Amino acid sequence: MSDIARTFRIEGVPPATGPWARAVEWNGMIFISGLRGIDPETGLPAGTTDQRLERILEHLSLTLEAHGSDLSSVVSTRVYVTDMNGLRPAVNAFYEKAFGEHLPTRTILEVSSLNQNDSIEIEFVAIRKKEPDL
């Protein structure tokens, strides 16, 4: 069995707001904890939905890079939104921009609330492409 590597801090990505790893890598798979659109300067959710999704994309890219991968290696996602009808179009546009022809699988769920009154949180699973920089 392969070793399990846990990442708790990634430069440029806000720290977790609780006791969990930012990412866990096992057997070439990268499991990334839910990312929200947190402004690293304030520690709070960014202003607009688009700004939150941009932050999620930035934090995802940094996390993948730290693990020797990139956006094209994302194979599965789970999206949590607090308003399906209002947020699904923005999430769809985000997916087209972020993943292009490399669309991962996706589950999208509406939830009653998220931490810090946020509106979107996304978990990711990716495949490692090369040895990580950890």
Locate predicted features:
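N-terminal presequence-like segments and the immediate start of the first folded domain
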Residues: 1-58, 62-75, 81-134
